[in-house]
A protein has these predicted regions:
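Active-site SXXK
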Residues: 209, 227-252, 278, 336-340, ...
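Bacterial N-terminal signal peptides
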Residues: 29-37
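Structured C-terminal helix/loop/strand segments within mature extracytoplasmic catalytic/sensor domains
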Residues: 147, 450-499
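Beta-lactamase-like hydrolase cores
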Residues: 166-204, 208
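Short, charged, amphipathic alpha-helices and their helix-cap/turn boundaries
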Residues: 181-183, 187-189, 210-215, 249, ...
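Active-site helix/loop module of the DD-peptidase/beta-lactamase fold
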Residues: 246-285, 315-318, 344-383
Length: 499
């Protein structure tokens, strides 16, 4: 099929696919700013940094989101936020002592920047949702006009409810076959890293449904919520799987909505993309995200600049046949979330909490939205180690919670099965979950994991009845080895009897 007539939008200017493929001169307009990239064939040297102001605007937006959630979602101090959350940024603005930023403790908002070269960026906390980033032309006064989502918490008090539905944990000895010293050594392995760029906030180990190890860094406790980053994708997949199980969505039917811009002749091959394609990160659509999401393109516009997450996700060119190429892209997840919204209608806003979070006791979890009320389930979920432990336990229990089946065995098989387009690349990715890499012989092959930026991992090891949760605030390029942590924890189970 010829995909050349499909077009892509970044910002508001339409870019023809032929220009993308031939690497010709492309002009992108995003949030009113311009990039002029010279033709590759011309080999001209640019002397002006066209990205400078976009980068600065988006970085200010990042800092606004990090500070707002750090202060009001995680309930951390300004000193902690600058020392850890903002270590992710190349050049944070100001210090804990002050700078070109304002914190409005009464309205729970943050304003970043001086407004001289680029607009000030603002983020505001909303109860039950977390912080929302506003576009440059909105202020904290506009927050009241945003779509209202009423997400009440359940009546049960977690502190008085026994684990795993609540946080009341009874002291119990380790099983006789578990080596406590080896478990402590694994914990030290997680917390005492050689690289200062690897910062472990919490470690939780569940065995046969019980908490057998729990440890937190100074200034963090079991109630501390931090961003899951792409571990949110696994939560999104779970919610979507529930709808597939109910027959409200289908893995192999077209997504069922229009892409942007709409095809003039009505013949748009993008409408052939299925839910399986996007959950397998194999949509065939143009990849626009970039490392760090620091530019004013792709999902970075939604995360840090106030753009619509659904408009951006639907505004990409089809450059490959769907299902034939794997390319990690936040927008693919957001297309799946948009399909979920279309299937749910008026039930959309309540669905994550009603169908999953409240069911399994994830009461400390917030699912954030963009300013239009669309869940950004590719990254913006805030939670703690215990709630992610519950999430992993749901999968360890084959989708059953309190004798109620929430997700089918078929869906669990899907998320653990290699995406077809990854088979020649090691088969590490499934349906928004990650698999053990080929050639890695130090961990069981049945293990699988969520994975989020800055070291957010929930590892499920069915053969050992284990869930391992590691939360981090890593920065830099030295990624934390979740499979190495799994190996170290398993050293404590060498005497575990075979089932």
């Amino acid at each position: 099929m010829d995909y050349s007539h499909i077009v892509s939008t970044r910002g508001f200017r339409v870019v023809k696919l032929e220009e993308v493929r031939m690497k010709k001169c492309v002009m992108l307009v995003g949030v009113g700013m311009f990039l002029l990239a010279a033709s590759v064939q011309a080999q001209q040297e640019e002397t002006y940094d066209y990205w400078r102001y976009q980068r600065q605007m988006v970085r200010q937006g990042q800092q606004a989101v990090f500070m707002c959630n750090g202060l009001f979602t995680s309930n951390r101090t300004l000193e902690q936020v600058f020392a850890q959350e903002l270590a992710f940024l190349p050049e944070p603005i100001g210090t804990a002592g002050g700078g070109d930023y304002e914190v409005d403790y009464e309205r729970k908002g943050v304003v970043i920047g001086s407004g001289r070269d680029v607009p000030k960026m603002r983020a505001a906390f909303r109860e039950g949702i977390g912080c929302v980033i506003l576009p440059p032309d909105q202020t904290l006064d506009d927050v009241a006009e945003l779509p209202h989502l009423d997400l009440p918490y359940p009546d049960e008090e977690p502190a008085n409810t026994p684990w795993p539905q609540g946080d009341l944990v009874s002291a119990a000895p380790l099983p006789s076959y578990v080596d406590g010293q080896a478990l402590d050594a694994a914990s030290d392995w997680a917390f005492e890293r050689e690289s200062s760029e690897q910062v472990t906030l919490s470690l939780l180990v569940l065995h046969r449904g019980n908490i057998i190890h729990e440890r937190y860094a100074p200034g963090v406790d079991m109630s501390t919520r931090t961003r899951t980053w792409s571990t949110a994708k696994s939560i999104a997949s779970t919610l979507i799987g529930m709808l597939v199980d109910e027959g409200k969505l289908s893995l192999d039917e077209p997504l069922g909505f229009d892409f942007l811009p709409e095809s003039a002749d009505g013949d748009d091959p993008r409408t052939e993309i299925t839910l399986r394609h996007v959950l397998n990160m194999s949509s065939g659509l143009e990849t626009v995200d970039n490392r760090g999401l620091e530019y004013a393109i792709g999902s970075g516009l939604s995360y840090w600049a106030g753009a619509s997450s659904t408009v951006g996700a639907r505004s990409r060119a089809l450059i490959r046949e769907p299902g034939t190429n794997w390319d990690y892209e936040n927008y693919d997840t957001l297309l799946a979330v948009y399909a979920m919204k279309q299937a749910l209608g008026d039930d959309y806003s309540e669905f994550p909490r009603r169908a999953l979070l409240d069911k399994i006791g994830m009461q400390n979890t917030l699912v954030s939205t963009d300013r239009f009320g669309d869940f950004i389930l590719s990254s913006q979920v805030y939670t703690n180690a215990r709630d992610l432990g519950r999430f992993g336990l749901l999968y360890l229990q084959n989708g059953v919670w309190n004798d109620e089946r929430l997700i089918s065995r078929e869906w669990i098989d899907f998320v653990r099965t290699p995406a077809p387009a990854t088979v020649g690349q090691g088969g590490q990715y499934g349906g928004q979950f990650w698999r053990v890499p080929e050639g890695r012989g130090d961990v069981p092959k049945d293990a699988y994991s969520t994975s989020g930026n800055r070291g957010q991992y929930t590892v499920i090891v069915p053969s050992h009845d284990l869930v391992i949760v590691r939360r981090g605030l890593d920065y830099g390029r030295q990624g934390f080895d979740r499979w190495g942590l799994t190996r170290e924890v398993l050293k404590a189970f060498e005497l575990m009897p075979a089932e």
